[in-house]
């Protein structure tokens, strides 16, 4: 990280370095309404995942978890008194929801929107010692379309400032121009002397990119702020350019929960998610459908992940309950959201909403009015980034709504890309939500029925086939051919239309990871989490991972076979085999016998052998690229599980331990699941368990869980060797 020292640039000689920012994570006490005893908790905290699942079907779209209720938090503290003339600021990055903040008996803040970050000047409410901070949070039924989490689910921080300091969220660092030879950076901020603006030059700058996320430090009044130097250009005719280089964003949509940890934000878990995505070739996320944790954007800055920063899931018309607060709060919430995030180099686009109910009205005037207002608010705070929204309706492409934003956000509309750009040459286009392919890791159903998709009308036929053939007992087939809604489609379709339309800024797949709630189309069949993820809820890759890796990292040798090869009772029956590879030729072998060598055709993103008959033994694929051997993959029929294999990967304070059921040769056994129980030694804490089964209602915080197709994840704090499977 490079440092630009600008100490004293505003008032040299008056600088005072004070305590800076402190995260209040320990020392909290908590109780739910109806309880009489406070108990210790660590913040961020999510009470909804602490007590296990509600009865199946209680609230499947919120994961059958007890998120509804009212919670009370209390923390006593001394200190944080600023020097003479200084100020102390308290920031609550997210409280789910309808919060009230009380300091020493005085109400100092609160927000109805659970995802809103609130910074409060608490100087006048502080005592020299004996301070008591109280936070109330209340979730009501039907307030969210997915699992929202409960309580103080993001960081609480205190910032102590000298008299001269940068006022909260007033700093705006932006790149005016940048080449490899030089850059000019503009800085503005508010302080007690008013608003200050200045520019400075950087010679031979290291430009921020996903591949090389170089960061600099700006020092003002003794405090350090990070920024990156980069130029993002969005041209409706030519596409997206980062530092002068054309690229299409290879993005995914991300809900805010962290799987078995619920909604309580954890940097190490988020870092793992981003690492897995980047290893696949992903370079962008969309924060669907709400402002993210501020710490997530810090990670994206560090790791090189571009962000479409999204504000709302609804406007005036309801989908949850924020519409009840819209008139009073939307201007303030949107303004402060943009002010908080605008200096992050990772943020490249703003989204003012997703699939708004206003788009369903025949008369578009309400949608046009609101979108125009919101775009104006964003532009008044940050005029450097394009504004978009997400629409799964095609009418807003033509009825005037498209003119309210810089780039139209198309949800599941790849067949409209070319026409839109032709009819709207001055408006950009981005795939804000694509595919919605659903699958359960390791599940495959037969027969495999998938009619071709060559036009929009084919999607209805494919959906009807899928509903009949690809859904069974709360699980979805893993052939990656189907989605539950009318406009959904497999990854291959989006790849083709992105390739055909380089003016499109990129895509954001629905979704990167399975998330708690929205178990479409299995809500009535016992589903608890979604089926949309490229990764399951535990972070294990589904088969789709390899089709994205092959497309997004074409220079990395990749080959992957599906399905697994354990089909006792199907001997001699047709069992189609698909291969995802970055090679351009592939040959499949069953027990050494070739099933044919195939060449990749135009806009072909998978190889298929649809007439293979199941014979136990070995599946092997060999691939080539430009005539040279490229990558291989093997699937073998497994025997009975004889041991539990173990592998682990550490991120910060947490170790993610994978337990695999394997046979005597070490082959994964996806067909013989069993329950694993765990004990711990002193110095080891079992944080959570997850098997990735979207229909499982087992307790994430328990000490036992059933494997799902041979795999189980344990998240451990402390010495991982102290986790002992029984």
Give the role of each language-model region.
Residues 31-33, 63, 68-168, 291, ...:
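Accessory beta-strand-rich segments of carbohydrate-active enzymes
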Residues 24, 45-63, 112-114, 122-193, ...:
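An acidic-aromatic loop/edge-strand motif
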Residues 83-86, 126-130, 144, 201-215, ...:
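Short glycine/proline/serine/threonine-rich loop/turn segments at secondary-structure transition edges
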Residues 187-190, 219, 577-580, 622, ...:
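Beta-strand-rich structural segments
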Residues 211-216, 574, 582, 588-595, ...:
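Short flexible loop/turn segments that cap and initiate beta-strands
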Residues 16-59, 132-136, 158, 492-495, ...:
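Accessory carbohydrate-binding/adhesion or oligomerization-edge regions at the termini
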Residues 234, 550-576, 635-656, 662-665, ...:
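Short S/T/G/P-enriched beta-strand
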Residues 43-46, 50-56, 106, 155, ...:
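Extended substrate-binding grooves/exosites of carbohydrate-active enzymes
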